[in-house]
Amino acid sequence: MDKKDFKDEKLLYNVRETAAVLGVNVNMVYELIKRKLLPALKLGSLKVRKTVLIEFTEKYEGMDLSDLDNIKEI
């Protein structure tokens, strides 16, 4: 990957962007991070790596996450 490609590639998403990608509200993203279901890092504000979002959606595909105390298959 050359420098031009790297600059055009978004690697980190803030909480608002993460919520938009996942189609949930920001409170759900904060809760997923708090419960360590969605790994994040803090660089000024909380950020989620693009690869983490992909892994998260693959890991929880077919699961109902609407109640984080009772995650189950759909």
Regions found by a protein language model. Give the residues of each.
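Compositionally biased, disordered extreme N-termini, encompassing classical targeting presequences
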Residues: M1-F6, L68, K72
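A short, Lys/Arg-enriched interface patch at domain edges and termini
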Residues: L53-I74
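Major-groove DNA-recognition helix of helix-turn-helix-type DNA-binding domains
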Residues: V21-L46
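Short, surface-exposed beta-strand-loop junctions and turns on beta-sheet-rich folds
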Residues: L46-K47, E55
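Polyanion-binding surface elements
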Residues: K3-M28
